Amino acid sequence: MAFSQVQCLDDNHVNWRSSESKPEFFYSEEQRLALEALVARGRDAFYEVLKRENIRDFLSELELKRILETIEVYDPGSEDPRGTGPSQGPEDNGVGDGEEASGADGVPIEAEPLPSLEYWPQKSDRSIPQLDLGWPDTIAYRGVTRASVYMQPPIDGQAHIKEVVRKMISQAQKVIAVVMDMFTDVDIFKDLLDAGFKRKVAVYIIVDESNVKYFLHMCERACMHLGHLKNLRVRSSGGTEFFTRSATKFKGALAQKFMFVDGDRAVCGSYSFTWSAARTDRNVISVLSGQVVEMFDRQFQELYLMSHSVSLKGIPMEKEPEPEPIVLPSVVPLVPAGTVAKKLVNPKYALVKAKSVDEIAKISSEKQEAKKPLGLKGPALAEHPGELPELLPPIHPGLLHLERANMFEYLPTWVEPDPEPGSDILGYINIIDPNIWNPQPSQMNRIKIRDTSQASAQHQLWKQSQDSRPRPEPCPPPEPSAPQDGVPAENGLPQGDPEPLPPVPKPRTVPVADVLARDSSDIGWVLELPKEEAPQNGTDHRLPRMAGPGHAPLQRQLSVTQDDPESLGVGLPNGLDGVEEEDDDDYVTLSDQDSHSGSSGRGPGPRRPSVASSVSEEYFEVREHSVPLRRRHSEQVANGPTPPPRRQLSAPHITRGTFVGPQGGSPWAQSRGREEADALKRMQAQRSTDKEAQGQQFHHHRVPASGTRDKDGFPGPPRYRSAADSVQSSTRNAGPAMAGPHHWQAKGGQVPRLLPDPGSPRLAQNARPMTDGRATEEHPSPFGIPYSKLSQSKHLKARTGGSQWASSDSKRRAQAPRDRKDP
């Protein structure tokens, strides 16, 4: 019924007097009687009622004509959408596009029985239409209301109203709901079809039922296909109905014009979706957003509930084409990878000289490209011939060509108070526990920041040289008749695959490594590979070796006293008595990188053959894991002065303000070098007698018998020793009779030891001082004592506790003659 008729049923309107002159005037019983007379008896009866009731003529000639043309006889059976007959009108048999999709396979839908005409039916006459394509959720608050008004023709440089509507359609993502009295614009309709088919946006259209035929003509010109029906729902509706007492009714038209987009925007006004309304008619629209859009949401759902479906089966359509691939814009993550993020975000990594983001991204892309198979390398092929492959940029375009932040200035760092020349220390970082209110220096965790760029470059060069050099071949043992003809290949090391082996923990007792000379040697070593060396305490105490060209053969680094070498006693180790040894022994720290070949490192594999005088010099005990290897008198050797050991970057370093000399070594080492040169001149006279003892004959040195061990408890494999050791083995029972001015007594035995030939090329090579001009850093002891203070024996004894070391040496010397057995 009309709203005026509904108001009559309300108790508030009983005996309510309202005249035509009041604004609230809406319902009039006199007007209702005049309309019933018009519908039942025609125009003459209408004018008679107006004159009798003395009311105004409230209908125009156009309205009278429209009412008379739309009068219908009320027939309850004719309202059934499943019925048949010519009275269906624009509903077109009541089958819409939603039902058509379900019956598109050609199978006819079975007709249901007609509904009963009972007063209280058991089921409804028609089903409630559902928003099956989806609808935005109803939210409590949609935001602040905003409105923009657009005119046609546009004013003040505004966009024309058709452009505003089409832009809203192209920006829709969820749903588009259109209510229109006349819809015949093909351009707007094509935009709606593309939004539903390509972007999967739900499209609902409600048009006036009196103009459905014009809408269907427009669909024929739009070249639709079956794919457009998937996300499209079209329905029709009219105005409100006016029922009379003569079982007749008439209906108004749908004059609402609005479009509801995504639940938060709406456009409404006088603009109809026609070409004339956008070009020749004067119209106005309002673009609304915010809370006011809720009224359009509720109104459309109510209209959709009372609407009728529109069938599109009579429209010629093509088959559904292949869906075009959706090319999504490539989104580069703003957050970099974990390895890059550490260097960019964490201030600690800002101190390290790392590569730029471009270089890191380039290296990572090259690694990924190298991992691909050969058939997949290169840019990936596009799915379609017209498509070009998209290459993702390495970093976000907004970050290109931007200067990196220097986080070093924001850190609590400071330089070393007394830095050494060429130090790689950049600064320190203090980490403070936030739970401590006033932290003391002892409660701070101090982190030392070093420059690792040079060490990284050297490691890369060494790794490349390891990969590029040829594979070594085993060398047969030299003939004893020509002991000085050849040099053993690969330093006489065992041959095997250079597979990386896992690191082992640092042992408590470590063997002293033999120092490798830079030049080739005239002594060849023949090494018998042991099958297995028994580790002690689960730790392998063997030393790794680096086999490769460029490594010199083994050379024994002998220990002499800092006094006159000719005054060596017989029967006492190193020519010293117990008291003098306790006072004058200098301990020199050796690191893993001090030797020329790196043979002092720890790792699996058999040890190099050694020409040490006794087992007591082969092994020694290390008190703490953090204390490096120690050896007596390693700065003054019979083969010439060795360059001062260089401090490795990974070793802990504490400076005491002492610098090396201008010639690259300590003054004490230079004075010892001069004394050594004098000693070599005196040994030159005995060169002829020493040549016979320096033969390259090898004797098998066996392990002690079962149940016995070496001096430090290490079961050792069979070893080959040079002729210098064979002289000791053959003359053990002879006593110290052979000890001459150029022989020295072994520490653990009673057999004199022959010094190398002073005139050998190896000796001359090692006797040359460093001339490269590079000032090497001193390698301090674990207690921070530089080399220049090692000559002060009492100062060293106070720091390192020499009595403990001396007592351990005396025990080893006491049991050495018992443990050493003849081969």
UniProtKB/Swiss-Prot annotation:
Annotated effect of mutating L64F: Found in patient with Joubert syndrome; uncertain significance
SUPFAM superfamilies cross-referenced by the UniProt entry: Phospholipase D/nuclease
Residues where N-acetylalanine is found: A2
Region (DUF1669): 2-312
Keyword Membrane: no
Principal subcellular localisation of the protein: cytoplasm
One example of a Gene Ontology biological process annotation: BMP signaling pathway
Post-translational modification: Phosphorylated in vitro by CSNK1A1.
GO cellular component assignments: cytosol; nucleus
Residues with the Phosphoserine modification: S4, S124, S127, S356, S610, S614, S616, S650, S666
InterPro entries xrefs: FAM83, SACK1
Keyword terms: Acetylation, Cytoplasm, Nucleus, Phosphoprotein
Annotated localization: Cytoplasm, Cytosol; Nucleus
Biased composition (Pro residues): 497-508
Entry GO MF terms: protein kinase binding
Residue spans of biased composition, Polar residues class: 452-465
Domain of life: Eukaryota
Biased composition (Acidic residues): 578-587
Renumbered residue ranges of the record's region Disordered: 75-108, 450-823
SUBUNIT field: Interacts with SMAD1 (via MH2 domain); in a SMAD4-independent manner. Directly interacts (via DUF1669) with casein kinase isoforms CSNK1A1 and CSNK1A1L.
Family: Belongs to the FAM83 family.
Domain notes: All members of the FAM83 family of proteins share a conserved N-terminal DUF1669 (domain of unknown function 1669) domain of about 300 amino acids. This domain mediates the interaction with casein kinase 1 (CK1) isoforms. Therefore, it has been proposed to rename DUF1669 the polypeptide anchor of CK1 domain.
Its biological purpose: Substrate for type I BMP receptor kinase involved in regulation of some target genes of the BMP signaling pathway. Also regulates the expression of several non-BMP target genes, suggesting a role in other signaling pathways.
Designated name of the protein: Protein FAM83G
Species: Homo sapiens
Underlying gene: FAM83G
